[in-house]
């Protein structure tokens, strides 16, 4: 037997350590982009030291490792990502890109973990930063991530962030969204879907991110698929660079301004909040008041100075009918059902491109 042989578990640990070190080297091989650094002060976001309202889009083309990417829309998104798409995002008027990243693909104990996937995520984020965008990296546990681990944040998300946080710790132009849409249902749902359970899951992730040396702004999604924020507890952050994320999707109890005030709006008056995901899906929800809801929500977010990240730039029939080379979805002559091309693409593009808007 080779005198330098190591037990299998030790060899595995050494390989993971070298893989992580290699990824960090790739990130630091060139200076981090100086522009687009994000911080929080009071209840507002700052970009390069100036008050900022995010205007962003989601990218889902790196939501799962390649071999675990399923579904026509996600496969299309994966294949079309590149410099041409990023230039289209710029022309759309966005200044921030949100990447959904697989929890399982980033968790060394997961069956779908892949060091190559982490390199791919890092390369995509670097490309966006080099193009001048601020970035959000969001850990996703839902089915499109390659495994269905929907529910509340737990040790899986913490392990994923111990892999991810060191990769982005040197660039404050990258915000870290800890866990996409804590949910009351799913394989990893908790017995109690409440704020104490939420805090018990989120705080260890905050600690892991800061222990990795990351000084980035941290974003924490609220309860009920990230729709609820009012009464959210504070999380302990030694850097006080912590903010909240809301996903204000249409629901029966979430249709008018009074609902929005009660569920997240009043909270946003005293806490930094960003809407990191939003859209209207006329293939699933087509009540007569949905177009009014969509227009009203955009105006509401603007009035509250809450940034908006539209989902998703690379997924068909959301912002664009097919892809970024073709027409935007529209609220004119709304159609319902699986073949609907209706949506808020034109609405959001108009907001993002209007220089008179904040």
Q: Where are each of the predicted segments found?
A:
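N-terminal carbohydrate-binding accessory modules
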Residues: 33-96
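Short amphipathic alpha-helices and their capping/turn segments at secondary-structure boundaries
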Residues: 42-48, 84-91, 124-126, 164-166, ...
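Short acidic-hydrophobic catalytic motif
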Residues: 150
């Amino acid at each position: 037997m080779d005198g330098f042989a190591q037990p299998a578990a030790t060899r595995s640990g050494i390989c993971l350590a070298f893989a992580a070190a290699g990824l960090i080297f790739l990130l630091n091989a060139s200076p981090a982009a100086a522009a687009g650094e994000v911080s929080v002060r009071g209840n507002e976001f700052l970009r390069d030291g100036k008050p900022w309202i995010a205007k962003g889009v989601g990218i889902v083309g790196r939501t799962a490792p390649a071999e675990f990417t399923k579904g026509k829309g996600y496969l299309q998104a994966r294949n079309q990502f590149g410099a041409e798409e990023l230039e289209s995002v710029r022309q759309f008027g966005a200044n921030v890109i949100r990447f959904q990243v697989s929890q399982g693909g980033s968790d060394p104990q997961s069956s779908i973990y892949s060091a190559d996937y982490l390199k791919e995520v890092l390369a995509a984020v670097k490309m966006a930063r080099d193009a001048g965008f601020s970035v959000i990296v969001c850990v996703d546990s839902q089915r499109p991530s390659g495994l269905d681990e929907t529910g509340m944040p737990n040790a899986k998300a913490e392990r994923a962030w111990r892999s991810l946080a060191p990769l982005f710790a040197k660039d404050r132009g990258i915000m870290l969204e800890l866990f996409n849409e804590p949910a009351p249902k799913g394989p990893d749902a908790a017995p109690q879907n409440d704020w104490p359970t939420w805090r018990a899951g989120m705080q260890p992730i905050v600690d892991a991110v800061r222990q990795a040396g990351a000084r980035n702004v941290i974003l924490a999604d609220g309860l009920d698929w990230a729709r609820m924020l009012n009464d959210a507890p504070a999380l302990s952050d030694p850097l006080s660079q912590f903010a909240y994320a809301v996903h204000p999707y249409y629901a029966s109890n979430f249709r008018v301004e009074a609902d929005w005030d009660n569920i997240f709006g009043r909270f946003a008056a005293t806490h930094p909040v960003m809407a990191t995901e939003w859209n209207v899906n006329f293939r699933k929800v087509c009540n007569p008041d949905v177009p009014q809801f969509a227009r009203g929500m955009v105006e509401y977010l603007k009035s509250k100075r809450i940034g908006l990240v539209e989902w998703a730039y690379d997924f068909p029939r959301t912002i664009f009918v097919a892809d970024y080379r073709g027409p935007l979805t529209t609220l004119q002559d709304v159609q319902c059902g699986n073949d609907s091309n209706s949506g808020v693409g034109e609405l959001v593009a108009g907001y993002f491109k209007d220089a008179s808007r904040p």
